[in-house]
Amino acid sequence: MEFGLSEEQKLIVETTRAFVENELYPHEREVERTGVLRRELIEEIKAKAIEAGLYAANMPTEVGGAGLDTVTWLLYEKELGRANYALHWTCVARPSNILLAGTPEQREKYLYPCIRGEKWDCLAMTEPGAGSDLRGMK
């Protein structure tokens, strides 16, 4: 049994590592010093991630993503994780809740635009007695 990385996985790691070094690292000092991630910078990085084929990599190809398998996705996330998390987050579309449970109308309105980088996805949770403390939910 082979436990090494496939050629595709090696390419994803190399591409993502180069992206982190060339597009994310140069902005880390500013973001960490100011505590601000400027909207213009978010849009710039997101556009470059889309151009590089790295945005929405976890989403299935049927909905416009790259369709990475779980191991390859984790390798991708590991490389992105080398950078400041706020910068890392600008490279990833995560509308998985809509993918898994959304209606066709919700997919059209939210999922596909998120995957194309036209809209931002987000998630909010609350529960009586826990508020927004996700660890306190029962």
Residue ranges of predicted features:
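Glycine-rich, Trp-frequent "lid" loop and neighboring beta-strands that shape
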Residues: G65-A66, E105-K138
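Intrinsic disorder at enzyme termini
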Residues: M1-I12
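N-terminal glycine-rich flavin-associated loop
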Residues: H88-E105, G131
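Short, solvent-exposed alpha-helical surface patches in well-structured domains
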Residues: L11-I12, E44, L75, K109
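Active-site beta-strand/loop segments that form the cofactor-binding cradle
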Residues: E23-C91, R116, A124-G129
